[in-house]
Amino acid sequence: MPELASVLVRDERSVLPGGFWAAVAVWLEKPQVLNKRLCGSTVGKKWDHVGEESESEGIDVETALAALLEDMSGPGRDEEMLKLISGYGKREEDSGSLTLRTLIPKSNPHFPSCQPRCEIVIRDLPNSVVTFLPLDEANQFKTNNIYQIRLAHVQDDEWSISLYTLCSEAWESDGVVYPKITWMKNELLSKLAKWSTEDKKSEFKSTLSLVPVDKYSRLYQNLKEKYRDMVKVWPEVTDPEKFVYEDVAIATYLLIIWEEERSQNQLKVKQSFVDLGCGNGLLVHILSNEGHPGRGIDVRRRKIWDMYGPQTILEESAILPNDDYLFPDTDWLIGNHSDELTPWLPVIASRSSYSCRYFVLPCCFFNFYGKYNRKSSKKTQYREYLDFVKEVGQQCGFNVEEDCLRIPSTKRVCLIGMSRTYPLTQEKRIDEQRTRYIKSQHTDSLHISTKSSLDKDDPPPLNCHAKNGQVDNVDSSLVQSEKLPGSWMPGFQPREKEEPIRNCALLPRDFIDETVLQVAKLLLYSNTKEKETPITDQSETVWNTGRSLTLREVAEHLHADTLQKLKNECGGLQTLLRNNHQVFKVINSNVSIRDWQKDTPTNTKKRKPEAKRTVPSDVLKTRLCWFYVHHPNGCPRVAKSCPYAHGAEELRPSFISRRKNPRNKLCT
């Protein structure tokens, strides 16, 4: 079998040959990571020897291999391949395996005839060789597309990973299941080489590990086609493509989970559901349209609710964790980015009825009482929070399963409570356990919050979420609130009905101007005393660009009252500085004065769309130029090329509708 390509790798961590087989496993079990035209694969039965039970997926593997041997035994035969296949049944235990896998293509209008294809994969452990034997529609071997990947030791820590094909000249490519030879050499081989020497384990499970990938792919494409017009009529300010296709993917996942549940438990009636914190309600709309009775509840009504029609039941109401918000007749509770309700989903489900199950997709980090406080720096904040929500489910008596969804989001791990760990007769005892656990979490929140607020050595907070790894302190006024009858936790605060604007845009104008000027002086001058010394040379030919400081260094020079005001805004100091992009440049948490001599549209790496590159004529010269007024060297641009007014005589009236909180004309 001729060699097509080879890549040399250095095994500095001594992970080979184990790392090679780990990389092969990724290509075997998750080919969509590399081949984006695939939805995934299903790995069928694995044999250590070909014997009596050699049939799987309607394919008799032993018979198929015998037929392949016969076909390959003619003139021009490949002795090495014949030896590999014929000797397979005689190999020693643990020396290799044979696996049947099915490659599942995505539905693609450019490749409408492409169907799932099977292939037999032979792993030869002693020789570090993996062989792929593809099958056609009639389950006959496509000998032209047989290929091997081999690992070989060169010398010292140097190894080679090579690609071999049986007949590269006659290779048949459909662009999906069978990629082109050039792709195999350039993409597949290089990735396998990279993965082979990586000593990195994922914190999360494989994507779609709890559902059949082929079934998911078919249903997702059907639903995507069915609800794609929602993108065209989306009335919300959010990105329609992201939200529509994300909800279609979540609905697909739930529908398959529920279908599998009905099949396993021999149920005929489709499961009912309630989506707590349903947001735009699209998930509720899709699930209802697909025949599942249910409703969505959210504290704030959305514009799009009116478009769904009467069959989609959506309610505007705040949800409180108490005895009045139980759902005894509901099969499933859903928490899709449900924020402060996320940890309460398992509790509400467990207390609604013994048969109630739940699905939760955590996003923002909340505990029972407020913002979640990190307890360990050994894990990422996301992983730690997932473990917390999983622990809540387990303490509530659920067998909690974890899976990764295939959605356009960085927060795509879901937790599912599908069954209980205890019999119904133990409900009273388990509920007492739940109560104790919730109280213990309440105490932990107060303890961590108090410790954080008393720690005088902590640097000042930079934004509304983080404080040296901690999150917002618990409001002490909530601690003293009285427990209402039937309430499970005093002081729980649902989200506000009117979504507050916290992007620093509504802060007092004087406060913004003062903070901007203070930060600018900090960057432009070496000290803030009366005799300020410019950072750069005082020569008139040099425009003072100042220095670069980190956000933390800037925050250390600001007054505590200023930081507290910024702490209540999303993004805090960073958002304020980015809002004033005429003055500042913020990249990777480093702040500097923007130099408009260099930052011109022609110098930017990525050109923005034409509509965003040009400034509307009705806003030109409607505000004073900050640099003209405040910079020691004035504005680096001449008045004609600056969109802001150089002096009051250049100011033009603005025709843009005024805000509720009007600002003065000084540009920041």
Curated annotation (Swiss-Prot):
Q: Which reaction does it catalyse?
A: uridine(44) in tRNA(Ser) + S-adenosyl-L-methionine = 2'-O-methyluridine(44) in tRNA(Ser) + S-adenosyl-L-homocysteine + H(+)
Q: Note the zinc finger regions (C3H1-type) by start and end residue.
A: 620-649
> PROSITE patterns attached here?
ZF_C3H1
Molecular function per GO: tRNA (uridine) methyltransferase activity; tRNA(Ser) (uridine(44)-2'-O-)-methyltransferase activity; zinc ion binding
Q: Which GO terms describe its cellular component?
A: cytoplasm
Cite the Pfam families for this sequence: AdoMet_MTase (PF07757)
Top-rank taxon of the source lineage equals: Eukaryota
List UniProt keywords, sorted A-Z.
Answer: Cytoplasm, Metal-binding, Methyltransferase, S-adenosyl-L-methionine, Transferase, tRNA processing, Zinc, Zinc-finger
Residue numbers spanned by region Disordered: 441-460
Q: Name one GO biological process term.
A: tRNA methylation
List the InterPro entries: tRNA_uracil_MeTrfase, Znf_CCCH
Classify the main location: cytoplasm
The places in or outside the cell where this protein is found are: Cytoplasm
Q: What is its EC number?
A: 2.1.1.211
Signal peptide stretch: none
Tell me, in a sentence or two, what this protein's role is.
Probable adenosyl-L-methionine (AdoMet)-dependent tRNA (uracil-O(2)-)-methyltransferase.
Family, according to the entry, reads as follows: Belongs to the TRM44 family.
Instruction: Write down what this protein is called.
Output: Probable tRNA (uracil-O(2)-)-methyltransferase
Q: Which organism is it from?
A: Xenopus laevis (African clawed frog)
